[in-house]
């Protein structure tokens, strides 16, 4: 039988999907499968961004040999982006780590020693000694962990239990602090619950898309393909793109807006003013479902307390707000006139009006999308709150085709970092450590003494760097992240602490990243389908996958590392006597027995796994660890608006969007007929708030922490490119992706280059007040900065752009502003 290439590809996809699901397939497809019968196919979510695409993974002889888009996956419908097609190759880089490595000299650990192979027992021996010494001498606040939005759900849950319940330290934070923390705080302030109310199904029903600091064409290309299809197939659909520089998403834009950095706050308030002045408020929705509050201002920049900007702030770090009347709110935004906004932002008046009209038109369904442009911002929480204002004023929310939508950058920044609660202040299901009732719920569920979980918020990501430098944090374990490259202000605030002899740094990673090479102990880690996992994507979709191959050498999953290390500690070594007296039956037990091998977690037998199903952790322990941890964790959200389905349902489905109630997922939250928590007759209910109403905040423009001046005369913005993911530790080991974009470049306006006697391809030294890097001048290509701004991606380990960035954060979310600092250029 002859097949065209198209037919072959289609049949192959259908056959693979059907085979993975155990279904019969048409004859043509069976013929194709017959040619590949040695390849076994199974489903998994993609390893990269927060879109949550479904892929089919092909394995053969113990290796991942193929990958294709899953045609049954509702997110991507069989399509992958360029990174997704090369997923198998991320696992087999030539420098893959396969055994623990410790800095040693003369046969023992030495901070200045060379990395030397050791066994896992030796690695845990050293870690045990370092942890116990720190806990005994300085207490729980001297240890910490930096985790990841790439952790599986049960890895994040296990880590949070180990630190918050076991070690009694809230000094655990995820790298999602650098990307999604502002979104979290924005959601909590406005709605009282985290995560978007809408879903990707909105795309096919929207009339307008507004991108606020989101280059979806490169960072969320599968979603962008759906938006492109919607725009090009309907002449009445509009796309507006806002950014501080021109990028690939502008190619589809009907209204491409370039604004002065930080002035997005001005535009947001102008649109609110326009809506009011043009009588475009949805009065029925507004009167029933919205409260108005005025937020504290002059809140600082999250820098060290000794920094002049922090000393000058009137209300540093204040999250306070007070009720206000509609007339007061109207007067507040009235200051943001068209003329003032055009002057402050540099955006032509006609473009501003066109943008405002999209929100004001009652007949247009509008989706607002944003990612790091909003979130990595010293007023990122405010930006999130202000975009919610526009949707709440107009009632364009929680309905098909309408709503604000915060896009995530990591595969489980939502499912793990946010929902599990691996932030220094959070517990599962939006609970927080500062709330006694929330701590009590967790302590009872975990069967640990009351008072075990500290009430004090732990160190967030940037504070961890500072504490390491100051010698206050002495044992530090990072997992599934490359913060030495990805975090801000490397020279001043991170490297000094990592290399301080007082501190011991552990890095768990599959590859020798910049972080790993700066550590004292490297633990080789299993990745992606070398373990059973679960991710939660940006639309609240929880997705599972099974282990499909084994990790190379002695590499172990983060879950295995956490659980096995917990065996090294008995309760008497980590808890004071007053806690042990409350539960004397826990004396003499290890943290493994107290946290993981409990009756509730260990009640699911390994026999639930198929005989040929890989699951290294569960088979070693003798019970289905992942299922036990998930079901215990899921209990916290069920009945509270975070309902997750039973564990087994996820292995059968292509993901389910929570809340999942009575077997039915939820596409749109907070609206009657869509959300099971909204009763008939309520219309809308923002049930995260006690009165069921969302909040509109009055928040002003405030300047960036650092701006160009006479000496440092250019804005620097950092970010990503299509071909590489974050620090490139996986994608740069894929030859095809590396060749496509082999090294970072400095995108610059041709006139700015000419004024500095620079030409395309020249080497250039980029200098800030904190450091310098050498890069390559690029005056063409995909990114076109305006005069006065340069853009540089952060994937290149040879060009550590975060030597330049400032560690200023949003004072409320503690998220770093990677988009705005001042630099100068010197020709090399």
UniProtKB/Swiss-Prot annotation:
Signal peptide (from-to): 1-31
NCBIfam families: NAPA, PRK13532.1, TAT_signal_seq
InterPro entries for this protein: Asp_de-COase-like_dom_sf (IPR009010), CT_Nitrate-R-NapA-like (IPR041957), MoPterin_dinucl-bd_dom (IPR006657), Mopterin_OxRdtase (IPR006656), Mopterin_OxRdtase_4Fe-4S_dom (IPR006963), MopterinOxRdtase_cofactor_BS (IPR027467), Periplasm_NO3_reductase_lsu (IPR010051), Prok_molybdopt-oxidoreductase (IPR050123)
Entry's localization field: Periplasm
Family to which this protein belongs: Belongs to the prokaryotic molybdopterin-containing oxidoreductase family. NasA/NapA/NarB subfamily.
Residue sites binding substrate per the record: 794
GO molecular function, a single term: iron ion binding
Principal place of residence: periplasm
A GO-annotated cellular component: nitrate reductase complex
Annotated Mo-bis(molybdopterin guanine dinucleotide) binding sites: 83, 150, 175, 179, 212-219, 243-247, 262-264, 372, 376, 482, 508-509, 531, 558, 718-727, 802, 819
Comment on bound cofactor: Binds 1 [4Fe-4S] cluster.
Pfam family, one: Molydop_binding
PTM info: Predicted to be exported by the Tat system. The position of the signal peptide cleavage has not been experimentally proven.
Biological function: Catalytic subunit of the periplasmic nitrate reductase complex NapAB. Receives electrons from NapB and catalyzes the reduction of nitrate to nitrite.
Cofactor(s) essential for the protein: [4Fe-4S] cluster; Mo-bis(molybdopterin guanine dinucleotide)
Keywords: 4Fe-4S, Electron transport, Iron, Iron-sulfur, Metal-binding, Molybdenum, Nitrate assimilation, Oxidoreductase, Periplasm, Signal, Transport
A GO BP entry: cellular respiration
Domain 4Fe-4S Mo/W bis-MGD-type: 39-95
Taxonomy, superkingdom: Bacteria
Subunit record text: Component of the periplasmic nitrate reductase NapAB complex composed of NapA and NapB.
Protein name as it appears in the record: Periplasmic nitrate reductase
EC numbers, comma separated: 1.9.6.1
Catalytic activity: 2 Fe(II)-[cytochrome] + nitrate + 2 H(+) = 2 Fe(III)-[cytochrome] + nitrite + H2O
Binding site for [4Fe-4S] cluster: 46, 49, 53, 81
Species per Swiss-Prot/TrEMBL record: Escherichia coli (strain 55989 / EAEC)
TM annotation in the entry: none
